[in-house]
Design a protein with these regions (language model features):
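An N-terminal, globular interaction/scaffold subdomain
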Residues: 1-108
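Surface-exposed polar/charged interaction patches
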Residues: 15-19, 44, 94, 98, ...
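Short, hydrophobic/proline-enriched secondary-structure or compact coil segments at domain edges
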Residues: 48-52, 57-69, 113-121, 171-176, ...
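Residue-level signal for secondary-structure boundary elements
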Residues: 21, 142-145, 206-210
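Internal, hydrophobic cores of structured domains that mediate oligomerization or house catalytic pockets
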Residues: 82-188
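Extended intrinsically disordered, low-complexity coil regions enriched in Ser, Thr, Gly, Ala
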Residues: 68-93, 127-141, 183-204, 253-276
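Broad, structure-driven detector of short, well-ordered beta-strand segments within folded domains
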Residues: 39, 46-57, 100-112, 158-166, ...
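C-terminal structured domains
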Residues: 192-295
Length: 295
């Protein structure tokens, strides 16, 4: 069996993702610049986790997130969007092998190549890493903001990672965490649970309809969910509350069948009724869990 390089495997997966008309339907005009990124992000014998982020309704676009979990000691990153972050890569190289499952990386707007990338860091429970990370970036206030927000979160809502735009004075910090399974079940069963959480932490941008929607979505999130908030420099929460649903691996073709007539069909109907997705979901499902390549 021929073994591929990391870059070669990523390029093949990218080709598959864009095949059968999916490029224009899912990614719009942003797709061509993505393949140019891979030679710059496949680092030595370590390849990052790569996420293609695109909407399932509205104008198509494509964002690219790359996350590094470890450092081989041969860290090369010829990426203009990451200019000015060399210090953080050296810092991460020095500590990454001493901590489990931490990562850092970048989020690129592929429609605006050259604009500074957002920086992502996942310290998980290692809160002692937050301020050193932000200090190297010259964003000490963001580190203090993350820690003060983490201290507000109730059980079941622990923060795990965050993202920021460097050098944007007054911009919010995106904070994220994994919802504990017991908490997910409790919130899905009783909207008063999520209301009390929002009130405790000071998140105000919700109404009754939103509470019911959150409970309904979480009742379908049997494979797990994470949550996201925006936090302003003064410590107040913005108007964003997001939920990411996880989907466990299935064999090729099973995911599409699941959403069309299986256990995920109720979730699909729910999202269609709320006008969160349209027919392009079928195009996305056509590439989900469809290929793997040995490297």
């Amino acid at each position: 069996m021929v073994m591929l390089s990391w870059e070669g495997a990523m390029q093949l997966l990218l080709l598959h993702s864009s095949a059968d008309g999916r490029e224009k339907v899912l990614f719009g005009e942003d797709f061509p610049g993505v393949s140019d990124v891979f030679p710059s992000i496949c680092v030595g014998d370590v390849c990052p986790d790569v996420y293609l982020e695109f909407p399932l309704i509205g104008k198509p676009f494509l964002d690219l997130t790359v996350l590094y979990r470890e450092n081989s000691g041969k860290f090369r990153l010829d990426l203009p969007e990451a200019a000015g972050t060399e210090g953080i890569r050296d810092w991460f190289a020095g500590i990454s092998k001493d901590y489990q499952k931490i990562n850092f990386g970048y989020e690129l707007d592929t429609g605006r190549r050259g604009s500074p990338a957002a920086v992502h860091f996942q310290p998980r429970g290692y809160l002692e890493l937050v301020e050193p990370f932000c200090k190297v970036l010259g964003e000490e206030e963001k580190g203090r903001l993350y820690l003060s927000t983490a201290a507000k979160m109730p059980p079941g809502w622990k923060l795990s990672f965050f993202g920021m735009f460097r050098g944007r004075s007054g911009s919010p910090l995106r904070v994220c965490g994994y919802l504990a399974e017991g908490e997910r079940v409790a919130v899905a069963a009783d909207i008063e649970r999520i209301r009390s959480v929002f009130q405790k932490i000071g998140f105000r941008a919700f109404d009754e309809k939103m509470l019911h929607q959150i409970a309904h979505v979480l009742s379908e999130a049997v494979d797990g969910a994470d949550f996201q908030f925006d936090v302003w420099p003064n410590g107040s929460f913005g108007e964003t509350f997001a939920i990411d649903l996880k989907l466990r691996n299935r064999r090729p073709g099973e995911m599409k069948e699941s959403f069309n007539s299986g256990d995920r069909a109720p979730l699909r109907q729910l999202l269609e009724d709320w006008k969160i997705i349209d027919g392009r979901l079928d195009a996305a499902l056509g590439m989900t869990f469809a290929r793997n390549y040995p490297v």
